[in-house]
């Protein structure tokens, strides 16, 4: 049986070689997130119509008159199940200076309630939204606050700056590219 390891980037192949894998076992595939955004989103295959996008932004009261807004995701256990970390995330939102749209998971909403954390006035807490709607917001926001490795990648591809709300990431290249900065809510 032939073992294969698939790497997003040549640097990941180098990491595999350093760990003792044979060069024939490692295939550099490129990043599928780039492919999804380029092939489907940017091409218009999964984009909202102009009218639907305007309705989404109007419903959330964002993007009017060139008013910048931020987007947020927060779902990692170390942030959501730790009241101190979740309070620090809310303090970051409070200090950011923009309205922040937060399509929150039900677990995150429940934690806010159970911990008695009142979201700041500039936070628009909504129920979860679909992927296409999320990409439209990510493409239209000034920056994104997130603890998601995937969202940081999507943001980098779309040219949207990000703030990583976690100690470490599986995609450290976003720091090298200048696409993201780090905020560790556990400190």
Segments (PLM) and residue ranges:
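A nucleotide-sugar donor-handling region in carbohydrate enzymes
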Residues: 4-80
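A donor-sugar binding/catalytic signature common to diverse glycosyltransferases
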Residues: 5, 137-174
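Short, glycine/polar-rich helix-capping loops at beta-to-alpha or helix-loop-helix junctions
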Residues: 11-15, 111-113, 165-173
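Short, conserved active-site loop motifs that form the nucleotide-linked donor/cofactor pocket
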Residues: 26, 122-124, 180
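Donor-nucleotide binding loops and adjacent catalytic segments primarily
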Residues: 45-140
